[in-house]
């Protein structure tokens, strides 16, 4: 319960501050757990600052009070509209990358090293084996489609440190009437704990098929992977989960992996399972996530070349948004005590004393690491300003030169499109819908984008 509670509170107050979500009432026991977790998180955050020799961080952007001195910026003229970005096709020795071989053998490893060291952290080389167990199978219906639902647990080998146990939770759903292995869209999901209220539904919203039903209508399957069964979404949990298991319950080093990288690692372990399941076409596995899980989806796609496609929804700072943009959520927010656990400790340096101009990489290079595989970047409008749709578009557009080097197509434009314009003719797609902080309105466009790859 503690993990779920912290995720929900952080999401409501940090990730999408302009949304009218209801904060569920907590019991006194839950209040006590929350306070203890926050205290432990602050202590871990302070310990990392001490390790880095940082006395203080710059103030975070305030997305809740537009009159605050540190109010989040939503003025394009003040957003660094023409950022100077690190060159994606120039080696560190200054030589230009002109061939696919040079990109794959030389430049790509340079970029990965920078992201490992400074942004997302390094995955240990000796990560343990995961043994997947099917703990239940259910034949049922989703709408009018008969489905087979497998409930799975991925048991992480903890023989090196039995004090910490990690079981990765996932469900896999495939059409019962499929005559051959099917593509699968994998989502970083979230389950509301019993007793917690979901956000109120919009009574004026039209009732559309769920994304799962839309996927099934194409003959595909879907999987829901619970990231918090891999690693907690708070700083207090960094000595637990897969990160804690690898560190034997000790604190992180400055370049150790954060939660985003850990969740992405878990997605790769799910893909390991898909490669063994006769119902699944393991060459056609997509990864999708929204908000913080959109960040994780992009990281998973960038690091694991087995993922065929990704839908990155409202990922914002730390995801597809350019770090070198002052719009909505910024580096200082992600380096703060509510979000720092997503990243390597080293990332905190760029919120004090360093700045975004000191970063060796930016998010256009993260998108470029996915090439030549297709990436779809989505965002909303009102209620989703925090994630900087334009900054994410700019990153996708700037990655295009790598796609073109590898014989594919980028977005095809550097001009930010009008609202609800679908850019899906290239291998980097983009759409900003008119809704808020939700992936739902972009699912039909993503599916249209994905069809040409899942044929």
Q: What is each stretch, according to the model?
A:
Residues 1-25:
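Bacterial Sec-dependent N-terminal signal peptides
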Residues 342, 390, 396-455:
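C-terminal catalytic histidine-bearing segment of alpha/beta-hydrolase fold enzymes
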Residues 371-389, 433-435:
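Conserved strand-to-loop "acid loop" that flanks and positions the catalytic carboxylate
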Residues 180-281, 316-325:
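Cap/lid segment of the alpha/beta-hydrolase catalytic domain
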Residues 22-121:
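N-terminal pre-domain segments of enzymes
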Residues 122-184:
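N-terminal cap/lid segment of alpha/beta-hydrolase-fold proteins
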Residues 309-366, 388, 392-413:
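Mobile cap/lid helix-loop segments that gate and shape the active-site cleft of serine hydrolases
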Residues 192, 196-200, 269-330, 339, ...:
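Primarily recognizes the serine-hydrolase "nucleophile elbow" in alpha/beta-hydrolase
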């Amino acid at each position: 319960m503690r993990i779920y509670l912290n995720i929900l509170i952080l999401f409501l107050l940090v990730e999408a501050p302009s949304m009218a979500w209801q904060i569920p009432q907590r019991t006194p026991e839950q209040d006590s757990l929350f306070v203890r977790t926050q205290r432990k998180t602050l202590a871990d955050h302070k310990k990392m600052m001490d390790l880095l020799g940082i006395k203080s961080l710059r103030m975070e952007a305030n997305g809740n009070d537009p009159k605050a001195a540190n109010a989040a910026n939503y003025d394009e003229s003040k957003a660094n509209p023409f950022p100077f970005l690190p060159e994606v096709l120039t080696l560190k020795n200054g030589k230009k990358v002109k061939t696919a071989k040079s990109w794959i053998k030389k430049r790509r490893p340079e970029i990965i090293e920078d992201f490992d060291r400074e942004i997302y952290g390094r995955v240990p080389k000796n990560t343990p084996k995961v043994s997947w167990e099917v703990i239940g199978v259910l034949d049922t219906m989703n709408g009018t489609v008969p489905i087979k639902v497998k409930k799975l647990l991925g048991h992480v080998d903890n023989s090196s440190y039995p004090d910490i146990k990690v079981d990765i939770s996932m469900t896999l759903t495939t059409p019962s009437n499929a005559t051959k292995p099917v593509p699968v869209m994998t989502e970083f999901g979230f389950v509301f704990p019993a007793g917690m209220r979901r956000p109120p539904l919009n009574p004026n919203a039209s009732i559309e098929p769920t994304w799962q039903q839309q996927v099934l209508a194409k003959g595909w399957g879907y999987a829901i992977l619970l990231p918090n069964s891999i690693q907690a979404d708070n700083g207090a949990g960094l000595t637990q989960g897969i990160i804690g298991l690898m560190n034997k319950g000790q604190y992180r080093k400055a370049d150790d992996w954060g939660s985003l990288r850990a969740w992405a690692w878990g997605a790769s372990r799910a893909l390991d399972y898909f490669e063994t399941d006769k119902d699944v076409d393991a060459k056609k596995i997509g990864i999708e996530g929204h908000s913080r899980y959109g960040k994780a989806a992009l990281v998973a796609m960038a690091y694991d070349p087995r993922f065929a496609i990704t839908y990155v929804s409202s990922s914002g700072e730390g995801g597809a948004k350019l770090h070198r943009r002052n719009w909505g959520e910024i580096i200082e927010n992600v380096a703060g005590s509510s979000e720092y656990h997503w990243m390597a400790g080293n990332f905190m340096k760029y919120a004090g004393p360093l700045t975004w101009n000191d970063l060796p990489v930016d998010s256009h290079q993260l998108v470029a690491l996915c090439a030549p595989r297709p990436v779809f970047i989505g965002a909303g409008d009102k209620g989703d300003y925090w994630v900087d749709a334009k900054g994410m578009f700019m990153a996708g557009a700037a990655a295009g030169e790598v796609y073109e080097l590898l014989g594919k197509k980028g977005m095809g434009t550097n001009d930010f499109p009008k609202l609800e314009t679908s850019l899906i003719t290239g291998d980097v797609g983009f759409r900003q819908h008119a809704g808020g902080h939700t992936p739902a309105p972009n699912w039909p466009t993503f599916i249209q984008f994905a069809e040409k790859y899942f044929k």
